[in-house]
Amino acid sequence: MKTKAIYPGTFDPVTYGHIDIVTRAADMFDHVLFAIANSARKNPMFTLDERITLAKEVTSHLDNVEVIGFCELMANFAKKQQANILIRGLRSVSDFEYEWQLANMNRHFMPELESVFLLPSQNLSFLSSSLIKDVALHDGDISSFLPEPIAQAMLKKLGK
């Protein structure tokens, strides 16, 4: 049986931490949907289309990864995609409590949806898109946190 997993998130922007998780998920599962949430309530820096385009660019080397946007309840999206595995990255213990709640809510709507938690590589465990945006906003060097095309797109958005 082929396995199909979803790695969902806002990914505003995709960081090396996200790439670490999706690359490892691609090694574990037959097909991985790198699912980018619209997340308009989070007021993202990049539009959904921009995030999809950038994610496709930096994951093009992963043959079994498909980048797709979505704007619906995760369980409904998973059913439509015929996926029963949800990949989530955990950076810290504080992430776990929220992810545990999400996993249980998803299971309420789709009992067969399994959440698989991956820890990022240790050198990437402190990264977050929000933190990187803040560093860039204050003229910090973001080149070690983001792939070059994404770093350039962010600097352009910030007028730098």
Curated annotation (Swiss-Prot):
Subunit structure, as described in the record: Homohexamer.
Protein function: Reversibly transfers an adenylyl group from ATP to 4'-phosphopantetheine, yielding dephospho-CoA (dPCoA) and pyrophosphate.
Protein name, entry field: Phosphopantetheine adenylyltransferase
PANTHER family reported in the protein's UniProt record: PHOSPHOPANTETHEINE ADENYLYLTRANSFERASE
EC numbers, comma separated: 2.7.7.3
SUPFAM superfamilies for this protein: Nucleotidylyl transferase (SSF52374)
InterPro entries: Cyt_trans-like (IPR004821), PPAT (IPR001980), Rossmann-like_a/b/a_fold (IPR014729)
Origin species: Photorhabdus laumondii subsp. laumondii (strain DSM 15139 / CIP 105565 / TT01)
Catalytic activity: (R)-4'-phosphopantetheine + ATP + H(+) = 3'-dephospho-CoA + diphosphate
Locations listed in the record: Cytoplasm
Keywords linked to the UniProt accession: ATP-binding, Coenzyme A biosynthesis, Cytoplasm, Magnesium, Nucleotide-binding, Nucleotidyltransferase, Transferase
A biological-process GO annotation: coenzyme A biosynthetic process
Residues given in the record as ATP binding sites: 10-11, 18, 89-91, 99, 124-130
Gene behind this protein: coaD
GO molecular function terms listed in the Swiss-Prot or TrEMBL record: ATP binding; pantetheine-phosphate adenylyltransferase activity
Associated pathway: Cofactor biosynthesis; coenzyme A biosynthesis; CoA from (R)-pantothenate: step 4/5
Protein family: Belongs to the bacterial CoaD family.
UniProt-annotated binding residues for substrate: 10, 42, 74, 88
Membrane-spanning ranges: none
Enzyme class: transferase
Site (Transition state stabilizer): 18
A single GO cellular-component term on record: cytoplasm
